[in-house]
């Protein structure tokens, strides 16, 4: 609640996956992100930004799924533009959860092979957590973006999303540093308020809440 009170006004930054599925910051016509964008937002009274990050084209092979060093460095650079201005910053795994599996989206494959999904999800989030472990509670991690599993019966679909969200919380909390207590943003079902208010949707247990 303290973070919600401090997080007064926000904005979303760049949606970086174009129609052909190749991740590039400029392919939707926007320029490369630089510090001036965040300085302008800050000057307008905005103190929180959500930076959607797509990782799928920048991961190595199983089982490590190593994030490309240049991509991780670029992610941190953009995050730091806002963080260094004392803004709140939300990061996530974004189009990895899209419906375009032919371009490499993989989160929704959890309904078909949970173990394979889980290995990749854990490997990616462990790397993200390690990179940002010393960022304070102005850095907020979001479990996923707009995911649901309509290929499953609805009871099973909700249970699967609940399982993923719990896995996310458990992983982040165990990863050390500020991750033990940092604010987390938990994915709703399709990020749809009506579907997320369904009784089958459950918030994960969080040891940071005692």
Question: Where on the chain are the PLM-derived regions?
Answer:
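Alpha-helix initiation/capping motif
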Residues: 24, 34-36, 68, 143, ...
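Active-site region of glycoside hydrolase catalytic domains
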Residues: 115-210
